[in-house]
């Protein structure tokens, strides 16, 4: 039983498969209001959305790999995983009433932890309480504050948020990623987009945001056997990569005549970029979001990071690819979170949930993540609303 000084939290002390390394601590130290900085908030976590990128890090690195106290003082490494969540505000920092009056105690919010707290201090979201910066939080406003009804027809409860806490838990980092990468592509109506990994949680959000930019045509998706699901969120065409191997040869054969105006890879398949010249238009951008193909070891992760850094720098005369390349990681902020929520409120964006697991079953949730067969977000219910 947790108290105000302790809480339930999943922790890990070594690298490896999360389903094998995490341990449930029923008396983990709880953050408190006394620890809050001026722009921070204490949140009671209801749901946590798992992230494949964090799973890759957990498999490759021990917790807090860059924490100097642990290096020099040889303190025990201990980390709480994950960073995307939804919940209820318990307490606010001293600056919040004047800078963010929309964030008050008892307000329902979605957001993510600061990178420093997660990756350096080991204080992630898979716990009953967490501290998060105001810049990476946004309230779930009731429908009555964001929409109006012009007719007498029955509609949604105006006192209800436009999205549930459960669905909202996966919208902060992934939603910001979808909006920000579409901004990077500079796509306009009539352009042609290719998304690899359309059945990933971020892939399905990208498809929906792209639909608002490109209109009825233009989004081509590579996925497995999930064509119905992918089309339901707005894809115009779905390529079954399991039946078209190698995928880059299929793209060269069928799309060289009208190349793509942007390619977004949610998986991290290097060959898609190294062979993309015929099917990605000159001057257009290849964006990689994924690390699912990285070897799950320290050196494998180091090699992946090195390759991401070198890909755009390698000269064409030495075998480089004459197309722009960028590895992108979400930068959640208030402005982008606001854009995400406006899309949700207009019914133009929804989170596809693969499965929901109770807090005690987080190991099973990680097994689902490790299978790489999830179709949408994997959610852990930390505590009841």
Curated annotation (Swiss-Prot):
Pfam families membership: ADH_zinc_N_2
Keyword NADP: yes
Pathway(s) this gene product operates in, as recorded in its UniProt entry: Secondary metabolite biosynthesis
GO CC terms of this entry: mitochondrion
EC code: 1.-.-.-
Keywords from the named record: NADP, Nucleotide-binding, Oxidoreductase
Stated induction or repression of this protein's expression: Expression is positively regulated by the oxaleimides biosynthesis cluster-specific transcription factor poxB.
Binding, substrate: 156-163, 309-313
EC top class named in words: oxidoreductase
GO molecular function: nucleotide binding; oxidoreductase activity
Binding site for NADP(+): 64-67, 199-202, 223-226, 241, 289-290, 372-373
SUPFAM superfamilies tied to this protein: GroES-like (SSF50129), NAD(P)-binding Rossmann-fold domains (SSF51735)
Entry function: Trans-enoyl reductase; part of the gene cluster that mediates the biosynthesis of oxaleimides, cytotoxic compounds containing an unusual disubstituted succinimide moiety. The first step of the pathway is provided by the HR-PKS poxF that serves in a new mode of collaborative biosynthesis with the PKS-NRPS poxE, by providing the olefin containing amino acid substrate via the synthesis of an ACP-bound dec-4-enoate.
Family statement drawn from the similarity comment of this UniProt entry: Belongs to the zinc-containing alcohol dehydrogenase family.
Subunit and interaction comment: Monomer.
Protein name in UniProt: Trans-enoyl reductase poxH
Protein source organism: Penicillium oxalicum (strain 114-2 / CGMCC 5302) (Penicillium decumbens)
Taxonomic lineage of the native organism: Eukaryota, Fungi, Dikarya, Ascomycota, Pezizomycotina
């Amino acid at each position: 039983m947790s108290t105000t000084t302790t809480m339930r939290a999943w922790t890990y002390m070594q690298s490896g498969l999360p389903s094998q390394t995490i341990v449930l601590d029923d008396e983990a130290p709880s953050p408190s209001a006394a620890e809050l900085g001026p722009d921070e908030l204490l949140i009671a976590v209801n749901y946590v959305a798992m992230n494949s990128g964090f799973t890759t890090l957990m498999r490759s690195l021990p917790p807090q790999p860059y924490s100097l106290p642990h290096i020099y003082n040889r303190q025990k490494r201990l980390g709480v995983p994950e960073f995307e969540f939804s919940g209820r505000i318990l307490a606010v920092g001293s600056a919040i009433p004047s800078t963010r009056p929309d964030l008050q105690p008892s307000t329902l919010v979605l957001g993510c932890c600061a990178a420093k707290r997660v990756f350096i201090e080991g204080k992630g979201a898979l716990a009953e309480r967490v501290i998060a910066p105001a810049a990476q939080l946004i309230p779930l406003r009731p429908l009555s504050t964001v929409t109006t009804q012009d007719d007498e027809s029955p509609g949604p409860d105006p006192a209800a948020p436009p999205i549930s806490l459960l669905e909202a838990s996966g919208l902060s980092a992934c939603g910001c990623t979808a909006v920000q990468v579409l901004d990077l592509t500079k796509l306009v109506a009539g352009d042609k987009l290719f998304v690899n990994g359309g059945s990933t949680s971020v892939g399905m959000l990208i498809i929906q945001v792209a639909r608002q930019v490109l209109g009825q045509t233009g989004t081509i998706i590579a996925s497995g056997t999930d064509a119905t699901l992918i089309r339901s969120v707005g894809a115009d065409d779905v390529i079954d990569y399991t039946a078209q191997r190698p995928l880059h040869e299929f793209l060269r054969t069928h799309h060289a005549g009208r190349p793509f105006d942007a390619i977004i890879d949610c998986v991290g398949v290097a060959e898609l970029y190294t062979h993309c010249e015929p099917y990605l238009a000159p001057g257009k951008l290849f964006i990689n979001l994924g690390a699912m193909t990285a070897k799950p070891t320290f050196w494998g992760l180091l090699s992946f990071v090195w390759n991401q850094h070198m890909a755009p720098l390698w000269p064409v005369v030495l075998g480089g690819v004459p197309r722009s390349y960028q590895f992108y990681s979400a930068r959640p902020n208030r402005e982008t979170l606001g854009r995400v929520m406006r899309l949700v409120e207009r019914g133009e964006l929804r989170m596809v949930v693969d499965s929901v697991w109770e807090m005690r079953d987080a190991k099973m949730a990680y097994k689902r993540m490790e299978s790489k067969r999830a179709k949408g977000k994997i959610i852990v219910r930390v505590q009841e609303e």
